[in-house]
Amino acid sequence: MYRPKDHGWVEVIVGPMYSGKSEELIRRIRRAKIAKQKIQVFKPEIDNRYSKEDVVSHMGEKEQAVAIKNSREILKYFEEDTEVIAIDEVQFFDDEIVEIVNKIAESGRRVICAGLDMDFRGKPFGPIPELMAIAEFVDKIQAICVVCGNPATRTQRLINGKPAFYDDPVVLIGAMESYEARCRKCHVVPQKKEV
């Protein structure tokens, strides 16, 4: 894939849970390190499933990160000689993240964002649609549906082993005890509002 050398850009990695988004983000961070680029990694403070200080994939791969409360804190921690900014679980940030990512890219940096493109209801998640719109590069990766084995593009939330209702809170931090990857056909949302 062509990468501009004379200006910044935005990369967005999206997909359902268990598709390897954080793993891909970590891979890109490690490649930037091999290229001897200065990198800063951020994650939302709310994501403390595996670690408070690291971006961690479900496979156990990890990279050190700064956990922040809101997107504006990225600017507080931003170091002028940084060449690459990586942000995991970007869907949990406020809408201002789009403006901040754009500002950093316009200053000549590479910005890599990873996150869920849809919430458990199958609806666009937080600032992700806007980030995808401004990005130069978007990778939508799939998981495997745990029900039928087909490619999965959705995240199924489970509460006591049953699909969560449409009106349940959108944000619930969890892992395998609360979520599964599902395909369109096997994704179930009780009481979903029909068009």
From Swiss-Prot:
This is Thymidine kinase. Pfam families: TK. ATP binds at residues 15-23, 57-58, 88-91. Belongs to the thymidine kinase family. Keywords: ATP-binding, Cytoplasm, DNA synthesis, Kinase, Metal-binding, Nucleotide-binding, Transferase, Zinc. The active site is at residue 89. Its EC number is 2.7.1.21. Substrate binds at residues 120, 179. One of its GO terms (molecular function) is zinc ion binding. NCBIfam families: PRK04296.1-1. It catalyses: thymidine + ATP = dTMP + ADP + H(+). It comes from Clostridium acetobutylicum (strain ATCC 824 / DSM 792 / JCM 1419 / IAM 19013 / LMG 5710 / NBRC 13948 / NRRL B-527 / VKM B-1787 / 2291 / W). GO terms for cellular component: cytosol. GO terms for biological process: DNA biosynthetic process; thymidine metabolic process. It is found in: Cytoplasm. Disulfide bonds: none annotated. It is an enzyme of class 2 (transferase). Zn(2+) binds at residues 145, 148, 183, 186. The gene is tdk. The keyword Membrane does not apply.
